[in-house]
Amino acid sequence: MQALRVSQALIRSFSSTARNRFQNRVREKQKLFQEDNDIPLYLKGGIVDNILYRVTMTLCLGGTVYSLYSLGWASFPRN
């Protein structure tokens, strides 16, 4: 009997009302990403997307240059 009361209390505390604290912004995001304003899709999220894009590109290009440097260094053995 005690387990039944505990389970009912847990169900009440984790009900759907706790999920409604955040506003649903799907419609706003759909309008933002579907409008035709000649901005690339990966930059439509704002300044955070712009920074994330630049950091990702910098890391990718840096890794590519470093891997080519390592291949070149390994291909000429020391005597």
UniProtKB/Swiss-Prot annotation:
Keyword Cell wall biogenesis/degradation tagged: no
Membrane topology label: Single-pass membrane protein
One annotated Gene Ontology cellular component of this protein: mitochondrion
Sequence intervals crossing the membrane: 47-75
GO-annotated biological processes: generation of precursor metabolites and energy; mitochondrial electron transport, cytochrome c to oxygen; mitochondrial respirasome assembly
Transit peptide (first-last residue): 1-21
The keyword Oxidoreductase belongs to this UniProt entry's keyword annotation: yes
Coiled-coil residue spans: none
Subcellular location: Mitochondrion inner membrane
An example Gene Ontology molecular-function term: cytochrome-c oxidase activity
Pathway linked to the protein: Energy metabolism; oxidative phosphorylation
This protein's UniProt keywords: Membrane, Mitochondrion, Mitochondrion inner membrane, Oxidoreductase, Transit peptide, Transmembrane, Transmembrane helix
Family of the protein in this entry: Belongs to the cytochrome c oxidase VIIa family.
Oligomer status and interactors: Component of the complex IV (CIV, cytochrome c oxidase), a multisubunit enzyme composed of 14 subunits. The complex is composed of a catalytic core of 3 subunits MT-CO1, MT-CO2 and MT-CO3, encoded in the mitochondrial DNA, and 11 supernumerary subunits COX4I1 (or COX4I2), COX5A, COX5B, COX6A2 (or COX6A1), COX6B1 (or COX6B2), COX6C, COX7A1 (or COX7A2), COX7B, COX7C, COX8B and NDUFA4, which are encoded in the nuclear genome.
Its job: Component of the mitochondrial respiratory complex IV (CIV, also named cytochrome c oxidase complex), the last enzyme in the mitochondrial electron transport chain which drives oxidative phosphorylation. The CIV complex is the component of the respiratory chain that catalyzes the reduction of oxygen to water. Acts as an assembly factor that specifically drives the homodimerization of CIV complexes, mediating the formation of mitochondrial respiratory supercomplexes (respirasomes) containing two CIV: supercomplxes with two molecules of CIV show improved activity.
Name of the protein in its database record: Cytochrome c oxidase subunit 7A1, mitochondrial
